[in-house]
């Protein structure tokens, strides 16, 4: 497919998850409705990952595409219908007999993902070493956590130009080259094994003999004995704590087999979240999730959340923006040359700020313009003017004066306070 055809095919899946309830806003959100170019809900401004959207097939397609044309093709299968690669995630079902008074019942636990190892006991041990709230048991908080991290750590728009908004043919080509490069140089999947199983593959680690020190004359006599008792000492690359014998460890091939991690320590060096499904990106001695690896390579638009492949973009408030996406977060009007106010790290135009976000003056009960001076005490604000910041009893101007605040009112003296009580 040529570039022009690819560009024409691009578009965001606006019907996907439509109407799904927001897990964060609850009934305050009318249901998920994807913004035209932002990756958020138009109704509540939360991301799709915060909504109860059924995305298992879509996520499996996304990860399958990530592994396409890599050494990890064993983790994908192509659908016969359309040839699209699908992620063959390992689902683990454990059955535990539960003794009852009269008979024995079976308690079944399903993990929506588990490390693809033949030894189920090892996989189970791996899961038990994760925080309980992050264990991907079907229907649990941990399963929701995994779903959220899949969306956050591995955005589809970081690897698939068709998931981006209005890329030019030149930008499509640059993105494809970028994806090809990180697949060959950084992408990896962790491997769960017992540390001693890797001795044959990895370089020799430090050996600590049972004896402490010996004289040269005694070395020969002690050599055989120390060889029998010496043990390999392993430590976690992240927390530097020692690994317990018999506990599973995670290896990252790109990092080298002289490094290993506790299951709970295999995290992104930027966001410090568990690397979802052990999918990592390795760069300069650090582990990254997909999102933060890409952030270390390319600027990301704070408006649409996509990587910027254009040479022309703007920087404002320590963030990067496509020129067309430096817009008001409320009304989407372009802010170039306009007055704006940052609200929760999002730029808002002056009219929208006054309408939706401005604090109300306790004196005149009107919104306080963002460019106007104000007086603030606790959660109350006043225009810093002789008409608004007055004693609630005698109307004396309190600018530059001591005052006594009482539940949204201010007084110039104890006497005035008593008169109003």
Swiss-Prot record:
GO terms for molecular function: zinc ion binding. Coiled coil: none annotated. Interacts via LIM domain 1 with ZYX. Interacts (via LIM domain 3) with ENAH and VASP. Interacts with ALKBH4, talin, actin, alpha-actinin, GRIP1 and PXN. Interacts (via LIM domain 2) with ACTL7A (via N-terminus). Heterodimer with ACTL7A; the heterodimer interacts with ENAH to form a heterotrimer. SMART domains: LIM (SM00132). Residues 92-199 form the PET domain. One of its GO terms (cellular component) is cytosol. The keyword GTP-binding does not apply. Residues 133-164 are annotated as: Disordered. InterPro entries: LIM1_Testin (IPR034958), LIM2_Testin (IPR034959), LIM3_Testin (IPR034960), PET_domain (IPR010442), PET_testin (IPR033724), Pk/Esn/Tes (IPR047120), Znf_LIM (IPR001781). The keyword Repeat applies. It comes from Mustela putorius furo. This is Testin.
């Amino acid at each position: 497919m040529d570039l022009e055809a690819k560009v024409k095919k691009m578009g965001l899946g606006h019907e996907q998850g439509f109407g799904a309830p927001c897990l964060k806003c609850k009934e305050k959100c009318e249901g998920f409705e994807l913004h035209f170019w932002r990756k958020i809900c138009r109704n509540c401004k939360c991301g799709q990952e915060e909504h109860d959207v059924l995305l298992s097939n879509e996520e499996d397609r996304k990860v399958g595409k990530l592994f396409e044309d890599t050494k990890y093709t064993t983790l994908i299968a192509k659908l016969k219908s359309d040839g699209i690669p699908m992620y063959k995630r390992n689902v683990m079902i454990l059955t535990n007999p539960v003794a009852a008074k009269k008979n024995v019942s079976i308690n079944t636990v399903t993990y929506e993902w588990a490390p693809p190892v033949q030894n189920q006991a090892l996989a189970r041990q791996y899961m038990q070493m994760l925080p309980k709230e992050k264990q991907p048991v079907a229907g649990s908080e941990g399963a929701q956590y995994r779903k959220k991290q899949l969306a956050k750590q591995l955005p589809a728009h970081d690897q698939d130009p068709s998931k981006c908004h209005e890329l030019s043919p030149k930008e499509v080509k640059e993105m494809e080259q970028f994806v090809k490069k990180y697949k060959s140089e950084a992408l990896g999947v962790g491997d769960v094994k017992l540390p001693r199983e890797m001795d044959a593959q990895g370089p020799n680690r430090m050996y600590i003999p049972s004896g402490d020190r010996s004289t040269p004359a005694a070395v020969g006599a002690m050599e055989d004995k120390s060889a029998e008792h010496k043990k390999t000492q392993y430590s976690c690359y992240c927390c530097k704590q020692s690994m317990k014998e018999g506990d599973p460890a995670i290896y990252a091939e790109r990092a080298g087999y002289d490094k290993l991690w506790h299951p709970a320590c295999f995290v992104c060096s930027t966001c410090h979240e568990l690397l979802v499904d052990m999918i990592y990106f390795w760069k300069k001695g650090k582990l990254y999730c997909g999102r933060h690896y890409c952030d270390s390579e390319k600027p990301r638009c704070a408006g649409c959340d996509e990587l910027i492949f254009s040479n022309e973009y703007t920087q404002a408030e320590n963030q990067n923006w496509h020129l067309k996406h430096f817009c008001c977060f409320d009304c989407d009007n372009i802010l170039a040359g306009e007055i704006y106010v940052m609200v929760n790290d999002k730029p808002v135009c002056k009219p929208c700020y006054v309408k939706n976000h401005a604090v109300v003056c306790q004196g005149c009960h009107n919104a306080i313009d963002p460019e106007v001076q104000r007086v603030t005490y606790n959660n109350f604000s006043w225009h810093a003017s002789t008409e608004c910041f007055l004693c609630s009893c005698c109307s004396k101007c309190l600018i530059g004066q001591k005052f006594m605040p009482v539940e949204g009112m201010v007084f110039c003296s104890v006497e005035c306070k008593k008169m109003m009580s």
